Amino acid sequence: DKYIDNIGPGTVTFLSDSDRFVVKNETRTGFSHLYMYSMEKGFLYPLTAGEWEVRSLVCATDDKVWFLSNETSPLRNNFYVVGTDGKGKRRLTRGDGIHAIAPSQGCKYYISYFSNSSTPNTVTLHDGRGKLLRTLEENAALKEYIAGMDYPVKEFFTFPVTRDGRRIELNCYIVKPADFDPGKSYPVLFTQYSGPASQQVLDRWSVDWEDALVQQGYLVVCMDPRGTGGRGEWFKKLTYGQMGLLETEDQIDLARYVAGLPYVDASRLGIYGWSYGGFMSLNCILKGADVYRMAISVAPVTSWRYYDSVYTERVNGLPQQNPDGYDIPSPVYYADRLQGRLLLMHGSADDNV
């Protein structure tokens, strides 16, 4: 059983002849790819293929299609162009990291916003063939400032788990203080979201409050558990009908692994999350009371029965048909297991959670 993804603006794109159209679909091969169809003849041929994902279709003309994909790594994306005959696929961007694209009509020109974990945003103007025309913003002053302060950088790693006899590598990162000493013992904050099809472990530039903790001597760790995005339909839809169960298992297993590292103070592990991440941090401190000493839960879902149906029923099915999928992951039923310290935060004007 699998849930059906949301339909977005780039799911179906018609060409000017009003007969051919490009469909972004993941159910044919298990990975999100582009396919050419005809109103008259139906399916024609694939435009892209492989064990990687097209993240978005940026624009299309009668002879070319431009798209973003994570072909090089689930942690990164790049901008590509391919002919509408499925031939001549070519990568237009060069930097390894995360690219966002703002195209002109017909992709005659485009603006690229690029960053990675060690490089702040760079904004450049290109023609539709990828040729650099102008650098609009290089953030030179910020880069110079960071170079002089030993700014901590994400270290990416994978955490292996074996589920139902299958080995799965989960993407993670750790941020250490600039003066990290492996002979010392550090407290750890796990930060995560963990929601369906989401990704937090990405090679992109970001500065947040967790970085202030790193400067105060904390380690910050993040993982994308089973059910998150960028790795194909099978991986993403493992959590169908059981939101919160597999993700909690993975997060607790990672925390137990990190607790055993020689430079970690196992008595000072905490977890943070907001919205779905808040739901997860509650589950983790209740079901992983032996490893977490603290949790921060902001705007959490505490029962899927009371969250909006347009989101919940798509991923979890109907409550009448799947009562266990609604109740077993609910932290309300495990509240008596709380041992550590819990900071619960919620806005009084929140019209969502």
Regions from the language model: what does each represent?
Residues 21, 44, 65, 89, ...:
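Hydrophobic residues embedded in beta-strands of well-ordered beta-sheets
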Residues 30-35, 74-80, 118-125:
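Structural motif
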